[in-house]
């Protein structure tokens, strides 16, 4: 009898222990962690149910949890707390931070001020299961979930005032991103308040934040690194060959250096290697791209001036001309960079801000019309200037050649004109390459709201990234440059060739004299 009592007591203790163990580690049946809320601060009723923020949660929809879910799906041990499957009872709205926080650049900032609370628009458009759209107060009519893990570290927000950023929030918590027609569940986005500058007035709205869309970077990386290597090789050849270090060659080297650093900062941004100095990298990249355009404009004007007015160009020494060109080609992009920096810090309206370093990209923001003012606008003007210079130069070459043929057969002048024409044609190809690639970039910016055109202009992007390769092929892998490079690298071989030729001539002369004497 005593033994039976002991066995019964042991079994009761074991069952009690197992039940407690199960309840402490159990999850709510048929309820995702993303549909739960920590209700530990709610009122527990005698029947095991909870009263939380005016909502009665039955006991079978509650459980003790000893973990929290991480963004990658792993579980992290935390102190025991009670969670309720509230999203089965009321429409939930998934926040990134507590409801009285503001998010900016992916970071939460605590405790909104009274003034900020007055600016807050608390209403959300929610699409019901029947397709109708209703407005709901985020705090009074919805259940706020704020203790769920952030989807990722680098997030960007959707501002539905922009057609590219339109979205639909559904009653079941899913979000439709209109741009690419992708449905996101609550593990892939979160909502939070954000301050928007609108002229002299600010507003605070609840907007979704989702993870950055990162396409494959392999192709772009390979093309850009190859392009950078080709630019370095081209610069090295020009620095090595003395005959290429004329005024045009020096300007061309400056142009390639600007292109090199512009691409370098783009590559650093692509691989998120410039986040520690994001704004500085964005402004430096902007400066070098603008400087490349100004150096190309210098080259086009130089050829126009030399061919249309050779006397005037001869009066200016090469060193002095290069100094003047340098002052202009470096000062103008520096001034544009200064204006852009000033606007980025002074202008309050986001539509007119350059927003360098915004949304995790260390570059000028290209999704608004402000990019046309600070980036693409100056680019268009410089492209038009270059077109004008090259057209005028081409017209002069054609007219001059026609005139020389009519007047007399001045072989010297015709030969010089042909040489000038070859140099001009070479730089015309350079301008065509750069002008076309950046023109495609501008068109891509203008039609970025159309998904079809975005895919089409992806080819143009690769063309743009490969400019270094094209320059190397056009300017280095041509017979004239290769011959000059060979002579510069192997001067002894040239001397030996001359010596051998002279010895051969002398030998032939001696043989002739020998036969004559005979």
UniProtKB/Swiss-Prot annotation:
SUPFAM superfamilies: Family A G protein-coupled receptor-like, Methuselah ectodomain
Compartmental location: Cell membrane
Entry's transmembrane regions: 221-241, 251-271, 280-300, 322-342, 372-392, 427-447, 456-476
Any single Pfam family the record assigns to this protein: Methuselah_N
Record-linked CDD domains: 7tmB3_Methuselah-like, Mth_Ecto
Membrane topology (UniProt): Multi-pass membrane protein
Main location: membrane
Signal peptide as annotated in the record: 1-26
Protein name: Probable G-protein coupled receptor Mth-like 2
Domain of life, per lineage: Eukaryota
Similarity section: Belongs to the G-protein coupled receptor 2 family. Mth subfamily.
Cytoplasmic side: 242-250, 301-321, 393-426, 477-518
Disulfide bonds listed in the record: 31-85, 87-92, 96-190, 97-108, 152-211
GO molecular function: G protein-coupled peptide receptor activity; G protein-coupled receptor activity
Sequence ranges on the Extracellular membrane side: 27-220, 272-279, 343-371, 448-455
PANTHER family hit by this protein: G-PROTEIN COUPLED RECEPTOR MTH-RELATED
GO biological process, one term: cell surface receptor signaling pathway
Organism whose genome encodes this protein: Drosophila melanogaster (Fruit fly)
Classification via Gene3D superfamilies: 2.30.160.11, Methuselah ectodomain, domain 2, Rhodopsin 7-helix transmembrane proteins
UniProtKB keywords: Cell membrane, Disulfide bond, G-protein coupled receptor, Glycoprotein, Membrane, Receptor, Signal, Transducer, Transmembrane, Transmembrane helix
This protein's GO CC annotations: membrane; plasma membrane
Residues with glycosylation annotation: 47, 111, 125, 201
């Amino acid at each position: 009898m005593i033994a039976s009592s002991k066995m019964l007591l042991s079994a009761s203790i074991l069952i009690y222990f197992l039940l407690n163990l199960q309840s402490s580690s159990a999850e709510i049946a048929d309820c995702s962690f993303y549909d739960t809320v920590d209700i530990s601060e709610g009122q527990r009723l005698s029947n095991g149910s909870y009263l939380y923020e005016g909502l009665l949660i039955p006991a079978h929809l509650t459980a003790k949890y000893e973990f929290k879910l991480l963004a990658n799906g792993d579980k992290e041990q935390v102190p025991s707390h009670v969670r309720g499957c509230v999203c089965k009872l009321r429409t939930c709205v998934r926040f990134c931070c507590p409801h009285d926080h503001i998010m900016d650049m992916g970071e939460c900032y605590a405790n909104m001020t009274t003034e900020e609370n007055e600016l807050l628009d608390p209403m959300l458009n929610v699409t019901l299961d029947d397709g109708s759209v209703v407005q709901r107060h985020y705090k009074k009519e919805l259940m706020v979930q704020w203790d769920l893990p952030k989807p990722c570290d680098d997030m960007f927000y959707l501002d539905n005032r922009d057609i590219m950023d339109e979205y639909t929030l559904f009653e079941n918590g899913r979000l439709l991103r209109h741009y690419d027609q992708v449905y996101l569940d609550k593990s892939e986005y979160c909502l939070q308040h954000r301050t928007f500058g609108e002229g002299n007035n600010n507003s605070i709205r609840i907007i979704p934040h989702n993870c950055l869309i990162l396409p494959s970077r392999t192709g772009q990386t390979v093309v850009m690194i190859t392009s950078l290597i080709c630019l370095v090789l081209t610069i090295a050849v020009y620095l090595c060959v003395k005959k290429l270090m004329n005024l045009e060659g020096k300007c061309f080297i400056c142009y390639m250096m600007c292109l090199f650093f512009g691409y370098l900062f783009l590559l650093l941004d692509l691989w998120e290697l410039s986040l520690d100095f994001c704004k500085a990298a964005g402004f430096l990249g902007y400066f070098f791209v603008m400087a490349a355009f100004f150096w190309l404009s210098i080259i086009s004007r130089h050829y126009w001036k030399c061919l249309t007015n050779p006397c005037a160009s001869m009066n200016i020494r090469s060193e002095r001309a290069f100094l003047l060109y340098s002052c202009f080609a470096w000062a103008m992009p520096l001034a544009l960079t200064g204006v852009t920096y000033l606007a980025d810090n002074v202008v309050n309206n986001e539509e007119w801000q350059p927003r360098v370093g915004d949304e995790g990209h260390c570059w000028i923001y290209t999704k608004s019309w402000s990019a046309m003012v600070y980036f693409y606008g100056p680019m268009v003007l410089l492209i038009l200037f270059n077109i004008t210079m090259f057209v005028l130069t081409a017209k002069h070459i054609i007219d001059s050649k026609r005139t020389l043929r009519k007047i007399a057969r001045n072989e010297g002048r015709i030969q010089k004109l042909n040489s000038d024409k070859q140099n001009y044609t070479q730089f015309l190809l350079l301008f065509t390459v750069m002008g076309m690639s950046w023109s495609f970039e501008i068109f891509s910016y203008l039609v970025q709201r159309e998904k079809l055109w975005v895919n089409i202009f992806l080819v143009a992007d690769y063309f743009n990234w490969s400019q270094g390769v094209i320059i190397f092929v056009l300017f280095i892998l041509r017979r004239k440059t290769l011959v000059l490079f060979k002579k510069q690298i192997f001067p002894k071989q040239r001397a030996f060739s001359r010596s051998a030729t002279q010895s051969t001539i002398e030998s032939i002369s001696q043989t002739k004299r020998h036969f004559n004497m005979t």
